[in-house]
Every structure is written in structure tokens, then in C-alpha cells.
């Protein structure tokens, strides 16, 4: 029996659930130890954090972008986001989570986690060029 093709809704849910899933606004505030809740909104508005609306229309944030121990966003996330096109809210998730030939089959997130920040930023730049940005 051939593999079933995912619907758009299923693919979206898979992206949101990948690598630990997503957390809401207040969980980000708590995780990061922020005193000012509006910081998360500013980060989102200025594309300094990966965010997407859930099925209820609420902003959620993939947990994989946070370094819990140090209460910060993973190094390189913001730099990559600055290079990426935003044709859809899911574009950054697709970029960070999928393996890329230029990264030896690894995902940009894998590169960031292993300290290969410049490689991930270069991949974001190339991804943007391919998209025509």
C-alpha cells in the first residue's frame, strides 16, 4: 500500500508538534524569566522569534528555539530569520526543521544546535535567494 499523502492540515500539525511542540505567550514569558510580557510581542512583530498561529488563532512558539538553561533564544535564530522570506507563517518552521542538501542533509536547526551558526545563516540566505527575496 503506498504511503498516504498528508493533508495541509496534517502537515501543519506535524510542523507545530515537531521537536517538542509549541508553547503559548505566557509560557515563553515564564521560560525566559521576562518581567515585561510585551517583549514577546515585540520579538514576534520584529521577526526575532519563530511564531505561528495555532488552530484557535493564538500565537504559539516552537520550544526548539529556546535554550532553557540560559533563558534565551538559541544563537543564530534571529540571524536566520532576518534572511528568510515570509510567504507564510509556516515558512520559518519549514526552513529550520527540514534537512537541506547544502547542509549535508542536516536541518538548519541541527546546525545551530551543533554550533554551526554561520552555516545555518548561509543556508537561510540561500533559501531566501531561491524564493526570490
Report residues per predicted region.
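Non-transmembrane "mature" sequence context
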Residues: 1-133
Amino acid at each position: 500500500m503506498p504511503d498516504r499523502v498528508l493533508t495541509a492540515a496534517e502537515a501543519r500539525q506535524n510542523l507545530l508538534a515537531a521537536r517538542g511542540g509549541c508553547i503559548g505567550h505566557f509560557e515563553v514569558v515564564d521560560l525566559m524569566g521576562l518581567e515585561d510580557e510585551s517583549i514577546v510581542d515585540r520579538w514576534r512583530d520584529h521577526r526575532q522569534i519563530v511564531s505561528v498561529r495555532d488552530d484557535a488563532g493564538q500565537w504559539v512558539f516552537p520550544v526548539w528555539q529556546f535554550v532553557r538553561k540560559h533563558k534565551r533564544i538559541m544563537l543564530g535564530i534571529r540571524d536566520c530569520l532576518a534572511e528568510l522570506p515570509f510567504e507564510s507563517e509556516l515558512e520559518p518552521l519549514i526552513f529550520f526543521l527540514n534537512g537541506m542538501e547544502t547542509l549535508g542533509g542536516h536541518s538548519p536547526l541541527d546546525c545551530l544546535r551543533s554550533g554551526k551558526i554561520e552555516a545555518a545563516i548561509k543556508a537561510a540566505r540561500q533559501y531566501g535567494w531561491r524564493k526570490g527575496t
